[in-house]
UniProtKB/Swiss-Prot annotation:
This is Tetraspanin-17. Part of TspanC8 subgroup, composed of 6 members that interact with the transmembrane metalloprotease ADAM10. This interaction is required for ADAM10 exit from the endoplasmic reticulum and for enzymatic maturation and trafficking to the cell surface as well as substrate specificity. Different TspanC8/ADAM10 complexes have distinct substrates. Seems to regulate VE-cadherin expression in endothelial cells probably through interaction with ADAM10, promoting leukocyte transmigration. It comes from Mus musculus. Belongs to the tetraspanin (TM4SF) family. The keyword Transmembrane helix applies. The gene is Tspan17. It is a multi-pass membrane protein. Residues 41-63, 116-234 are extracellular.
């Protein structure tokens, strides 16, 4: 009988997974670099880059931080995944996997803690919003963010309009010389659909009136309660987005680990 010869195929790196991971990460790299550039440009316009102490001078949140942090994380992840896949560099691929895995577990832990400690989270959110209410006039980006939130969720302050008493320009003390005394920002006002020109003085002296008289002119519900209501009303959409992000992260992890295994198998045959 003729001898049977068995042929073994040498292991090779899968091109599909390699270039899919490369393409997947180059998008994140570019987007991250764009966010980071926008953040640094915004800081440059505000003079923060020439005066780093300005970062700590602001009592509230500087929204530019979101662009810088998100852009920085996306840039680092995108670079490691992109170059690691293209150059078949196991160190960069492992770094990508560990970094992405750490972010995933931090997100998972944050979600669990937010569910378990709902009351504590609510109190912290109240405190966070009120700290930003105090700093409303200190930073234009923060001011625009608060105005957007109050208009979008039809709310005013953390718990209600009286939270604006925390701001030096809007408080009702006799020593306050501001024209905005006992008022609220225009973003708290109930807009008239027929009004073409925005009335930025609509909130002046409004808190001198009784609460029932305020209801037709300004939003009387707090932003924390309105945000919770929005989450409940859009729970399916929010959950879908979060699950989608988690699946993308798991998919990226699997691709990176599979590529590392292929590279190790090829190197083992050298």
């Amino acid at each position: 009988m003729p001898g049977k010869h068995q042929q073994f195929q040498d292991p090779e790196v899968g091109c599909c997974g390699k270039y899919f991971l490369f393409g997947f990460n180059i998008v994140f790299w570019v987007l991250g670099a764009l966010f980071l550039a926008i953040g640094l440009w915004a800081w440059g316009e505000k003079g923060v880059l020439s005066n780093i102490s300005a970062l700590t001078d602001l009592g509230g949140l500087d929204p530019v931080w979101l662009f810088v942090v998100v852009g920085g994380v996306m840039s680092v992840l995108g670079f490691a995944g992109c170059i690691g896949a293209l150059r078949e560099n196991t160190f960069l691929l492992k770094f990508f996997s560990v970094f992405l895995g750490l972010i995933f577990f931090l997100e998972l832990a944050a979600g669990i803690l937010a569910f378990v400690f709902k009351d504590w989270i609510r109190d912290q959110l109240n405190l966070f919003i009120n700290n930003n209410v105090k700093a409303y006039r200190d930073d234009l980006d923060l001011q625009n963010l608060i105005d957007f939130a109050q208009e979008y969720w039809s709310c005013c302050g953390a718990r209600g309009p009286n939270d604006w008493n925390l701001n030096i320009y809007f408080n009702c003390t006799d020593l306050n010389p501001s024209r905005e005394r006992c008022g609220v920002p225009f973003s708290c006002c109930v807009r008239d659909p027929a009004e073409d020109v925005l009335n930025t003085q609509c909130g002046y002296d409004i808190r001198l009136k009784l609460e029932l008289e305020q209801e037709g002119s300004i939003y009387t519900k707090g932003c924390v309660g309105q945000f919770e209501k929005w989450l409940q009303d859009n729970l399916i959409v929010v959950a879908g987005v979060l699950v989608g992000i988690a699946l993308l992260q798991i998919f990226g992890l699997c691709l990176a680990q599979n590529l590392v295994s292929d590279i190790k198998a090829v190197k083992a045959n050298w």
